[in-house]
């Protein structure tokens, strides 16, 4: 059996911890067979455990503590700790792994609830499970969501050659914000979502770049403004910090994406990728 989970990009505009979409990078997991102990084959680096400390296995064991050990193979082209949902993809793979080995037929809603209870917020795990663009809220243990299709728009990921820990990047955020700022953020997010629904990427782009929650605190470490200026010079609708970074995502007219990729690739040592939106969430094969 095989499991495939897409990468995700989240935190569009003021949709902090709420708005995310799936993209065409993947974590792939193959169940090779039963084993005396958990054994994970991968070439993702020495920092990724190859035993039951691996996030995929640790997640599966949270759901089914007595889950029988297996030998599995993991491959992934999702950049690690770069704001493209690498940890969420591992968590979702772990939920699916538990379901397959224990022969549990959990509903999508139950899987979403499990993922949110572990992750704490739905912006990455929801599109990883559902695919597409997902608008969601997780409050007092209850998840509500709407899955949408993204408008026809090009997507570029500017992936710097340095990692940023989500935990560390959350520590730089304030614990509170002024009421008037919260009202402003709410109204910006409302119109941004409405613009995406109408396919008005010009208006949506303006609003995506009016984040009030995290970018101004996190971009002291990331070259967002510089990349934003370059991208707009070549016709981009919007740039934003994907997740906690370090990836900067760029939305642009499809016909402009190749030029933006070319220009940004010459700018630094970052890995610049032209991506596409993934309508499918986690899938199993075989």
What are these regions, as identified by a protein language model?
Residues 1-82, 100, 104-106, 275-280, ...:
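ATP-binding N-lobe of GHMP and related small-molecule kinases
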Residues 25, 84-107, 129-134:
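DPxDG-like acidic metal-binding loop motif
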Residues 134, 138-144, 163-194:
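Anionic-ligand binding region
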Residues 33, 160, 250-254:
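Short beta-strand-to-loop capping motifs
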Residues 106-152, 239:
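Alpha/beta catalytic cores of group-transfer enzymes, especially the acyltransferase/condensing modules
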Residues 34, 65-71, 98-114, 140-144, ...:
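Phosphate-handling active-site elements
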Residues 5-17, 76-100, 120-123, 238-246:
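Glycine/serine-rich anion-binding loops at beta->alpha junctions
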Residues 196-286:
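Glycine-rich, charge-dense phosphate/pyrophosphate-binding loop(s)
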């Amino acid at each position: 059996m095989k499991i495939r989970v897409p990468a995700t990009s989240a935190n569009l505009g003021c949709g902090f911890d709420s708005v995310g979409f799936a993209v065409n990078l993947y974590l792939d997991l193959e169940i090779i067979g039963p084993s005396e102990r958990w054994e994970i084959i991968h070439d993702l680096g020495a920092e990724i455990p190859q035993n039951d400390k691996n996030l995929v296995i640790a997640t599966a064991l949270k759901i089914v503590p007595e889950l029988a050990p297996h030998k599995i193979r993991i491959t992934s082209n999702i950049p690690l700790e770069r704001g493209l949902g690498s940890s969420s993809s591992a968590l979702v793979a772990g939920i699916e792994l538990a379901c397959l080995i224990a022969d549990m037929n959990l509903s999508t809603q139950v899987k979403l609830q499990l993922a949110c209870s572990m992750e704490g917020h739905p912006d990455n795990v929801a599109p990883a499970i559902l695919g597409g663009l997902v608008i969601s809220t997780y409050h007092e243990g209850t998840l509500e969501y709407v899955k949408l299709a993204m408008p026809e728009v090009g997507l570029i990921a500017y992936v710097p050659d340095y990692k940023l820990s989500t935990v560390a990047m959350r520590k730089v955020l304030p614990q509170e914000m002024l009421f008037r700022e919260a009202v402003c953020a709410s109204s910006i997010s409302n119109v941004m979502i409405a613009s995406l629904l109408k396919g008005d990427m010009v208006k949506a782009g303006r609003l995506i770049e009016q984040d009030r929650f995290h970018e101004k605190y996190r971009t002291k470490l990331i070259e967002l403004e510089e990349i934003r200026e370059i991208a707009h010079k070549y016709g981009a609708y919007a740039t934003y910090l994907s997740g906690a970074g370090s990836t900067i995502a760029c939305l642009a007219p499809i016909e402009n994406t190749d030029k933006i990729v070319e220009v940004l690739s010459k700018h630094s040592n970052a890995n610049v990728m032209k991506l596409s939106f993934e309508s499918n969430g986690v899938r199993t094969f075989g």
